[in-house]
């Protein structure tokens, strides 16, 4: 094998000790984690929003967003529960492009994974301790989960990872809510098999040890649209798509059935303003059908301080990966959801 070591072996406990939750911050996180679990289990009927930037490319911009989101959360907490996207590792279709904070703690400088790992923990820690929001991240690298598992409240297994056995098995050992996206092909069997594997006990090798998990009953579905062989996006948030997904959920008899609609990616064709329309249409479908209302109880929304995207990090709070809703549009959408739920 041709692997050249660029650093000494990372001591996970030393890294975790640099930003460890204690006192009021730890109590706040535990309380919010319990509320989130109750939502996934169907004991709390609030709508879940996993919301925030496509990628957390700038610590101060992310914190400014988190402060605004925290203030908004207080106003709508009786109908909506929000977990903030703090996505620090980004899958790339061909391996090129910005790969996230863990690779590049400064988006304008050379990659540094050692500094990136510290930056990832620091950012999750600061969002929780300075704003009271709890966070979501994507499990792109399963072996890195011990670096953040004490800080995050929600984990997503992405469209390119959902069929991977290691991702599924590691998710089975997570003690927090974990969403599985449908693959880019749109094959729901792949997603549901991932959820099934994660909800059950597994034995496997992890970090050089043989481990056994108890299963993660909080694993659930995220519909993110698909791409056909010609590169055309195929949304799967429509009424018939939802009924098909619910039917498959019921046939498999999985625990805690819960569906999140990812409003961007191949549902919107990355036309970020379409996220608003997709939310509206889904809320209408919930009103039309009690089964949809029972199962579809969350949205994943990509939003940041400024609308759209940019190639280089020039505008503060504007995405350098997928285009996002800006803050004004985000706040208006969240308030609209709140009002609709009260009607």
Language-model region placement:
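N- or domain-start disorder-to-order transition segments that initiate the globular core
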Residues: 1-41
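Glycine-rich phosphate/diphosphate-binding loops that line cofactor/substrate pockets in enzymes
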Residues: 37-45, 251-256
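Conserved phosphate/anionic-ligand binding catalytic regions in large, soluble enzymes, centered on
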Residues: 48-61, 322
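Conserved, mostly hydrophobic/aromatic
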Residues: 52, 261, 326
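Short acidic, Gly/Ser-rich segments with clustered Asp/Glu that frequently serve as metal-coordination loops
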Residues: 54-57, 256, 264-270
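Active-site-facing alpha/beta catalytic cores
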Residues: 66, 79-244, 248, 265-270, ...
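Internal helix-turn-beta structural module
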Residues: 303-341
